[in-house]
Amino acid sequence: MKKTLIGLFLVLGAASFADAGKIEAKGGIDLGGKYHYGKNYKNQKVKKSSGEIGAEYRYEVTPGLEVGGGTAFQFHKDLKDKVSGQNLKNYNSFPLYGTAKYTFDTQTAVKPYVKGDLGYSFNNGDHDYGNVGKFKAKGGAYYGVGGGVNFNNVNVELMFKENKGKYEYEGPLGVKSKYNADYKRVSLGVGYDFNLGN
């Protein structure tokens, strides 16, 4: 949570020095979310309650093209699939990322757009299962790509997103190993743009 607050402070701080631009408050739900571990472990689905809340600051650099940055608290640690010998829970994420958004001028109130995010995911989800062993979450790259529509400052979008991650495992006898834990999903999001400046 501390990383999310720092990220929001950076986003709002950048906006306070800007003459124009916008802040978007947003949230979303995950569709088909699943952790991918590689060939040695079984992939696991997350619960339907997974999603995110966050904020972005963007400013227009050329007509239709906005760039900026954002952060979010993404909650997806709770697993629907329980697999013997694997985590009972995984990690939540706090990404910090740059973003680019292009809105098409349709000469109507409804304007479609495409969007891409790229940054780093701070993953939080260490677990100690006693005799089974300890699992420590590590961060990795974060990206998202997709599109949506804007109507009267309201954005509705559909994006494919991935948080790269790893787990370090330490067994009861001190045996250590690492494995990938990449979280992939389609995100259905809704946001509202607050315009700054003139």
Language-model features: locations:
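Sec-dependent N-terminal signal peptides
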Residues: 4-13
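Outer-membrane beta-barrel translocator domains and adjoining extracellular loop/strand segments
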Residues: 35-45, 79-87, 124-134, 166-176
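Membrane-embedded beta-strand positions of outer-membrane beta-barrel proteins
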Residues: 23-27, 69-71, 98-100, 114-118, ...
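Repeated loop/turn-to-beta-strand initiation elements of outer-membrane beta-barrel proteins
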Residues: 23, 64-67, 107-110, 151-158, ...
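Residues that define the transmembrane beta-barrel architecture of outer-membrane proteins
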Residues: 21, 45-53, 90-96, 110, ...
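Short glycine/proline- and aromatic-enriched beta-strand/turn motifs that initiate or cap beta-hairpins
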Residues: 18-59, 100, 118, 125, ...
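Glycine- and aromatic-enriched membrane insertion/assembly motifs of diderm outer-membrane
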Residues: 22-31, 41-96, 155
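Predominantly the C-terminal beta-signal and adjacent terminal strand-loop region
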Residues: 36, 74-80, 143, 148-198
